[in-house]
From Swiss-Prot:
Organism annotation: Oryza sativa subsp. japonica (Rice)
Cellular compartments annotated: Vacuole membrane
Transmembrane stretches, start-end: 60-80, 90-110, 149-169, 176-196, 209-229
Membrane topology (Cytoplasmic): 1-59, 111-148, 197-208
Membrane topology: Multi-pass membrane protein
Keyword hit for Membrane: yes
Protein name listed in UniProt: Vacuolar iron transporter homolog 1
Length: 232
């Protein structure tokens, strides 16, 4: 009887040891899965940087700078086609800078604020009306004010490039050439920067930005030149 009992104990002990050794290995996998499902934030991953809010104002800054450069350069070239005076081109470029910066800021503020309302309502529904862990989730929402300021400042910075390059040049041909040259350099720079940040092809992005800017300036110049020729 003692031999049989020892045999049963000896036969059962390896399985018990296997279960004891298997449990510690299974627990970290479950913890890792829970951490991954919670958002992928770990102590060594970025130090808790809020990339959602950063991407929001970075996108607004890039779009604002590109819009400011293309719109003001096209406006100055178009006005120069109809009215070749330096004052007309300078005033039109300055008006485009101020109006465009205000428009971009207001539009970005309204759109981001609407996005925040939608995300906040979604978070509230997911929490089921509870206030637990609400502070951490609310911090992940993008800031409408930051996006509006970034959009306005970037638009003004992009618009200032063609304005300063051609607004104070007296000869008409040199003025238009300066605006086009400064705009081309700025467009190429924005294309390369956006491609580098996004991990895309640098050359293709730069060419795409250049072609788009040249097309906008050419269309504006052609339309206003047509109006100027007919005395409108």
């Amino acid at each position: 009887m003692a031999i049989d009992l020892g045999c049963h104990v000896g036969c059962a002990s390896p399985e018990t040891k296997q279960e004891e050794t298997a449990d510690p290995t299974a627990a970290p996998v479950v913890v890792d899965d829970v951490e991954a499902a919670a958002g992928g934030r770990r102590p060594g991953d970025g130090g808790g940087v809020n990339y959602v809010a950063r991407a929001q104002w970075l996108r607004a800054a890039v779009l604002g700078a590109n819009d400011g450069l293309v719109s003001v350069a096209s406006l100055m070239v178009g006005v120069g086609a109809a009215n070749g005076t330096r004052r007309a081109m300078l005033v039109s470029g300055l008006a485009g800078l101020v109006a465009g910066a205000c428009s971009m800021a207001i539009g970005e503020f309204v759109s981001v604020y609407a996005q925040c309302d939608i995300q906040a309502a979604q978070i509230e529904r997911a929490r089921g009306g509870k206030d637990a862990d609400g502070g951490e989730e609310e911090e992940e929402l993008p800031s409408p004010t930051m996006a509006a300021v970034a959009s306005a400042l970037s638009f003004a910075a992009g618009a200032a490039l063609p304005l300063l390059a051609g607004g104070f040049v007296r000869p008409w041909a040199a003025r238009v050439a300066a605006v086009c040259a400064a705009s081309s350099l700025g467009l190429a720079g924005f294309g390369v920067a956006s491609a580098y940040l996004g991990g895309a092809g640098v050359a293709r992005s730069g060419v795409r930005m250049l072609v788009g800017g040249w097309l906008a300036m050419a269309v504006t110049y052609g339309v206003l030149k047509l109006f100027g020729m007919h005395g409108v």
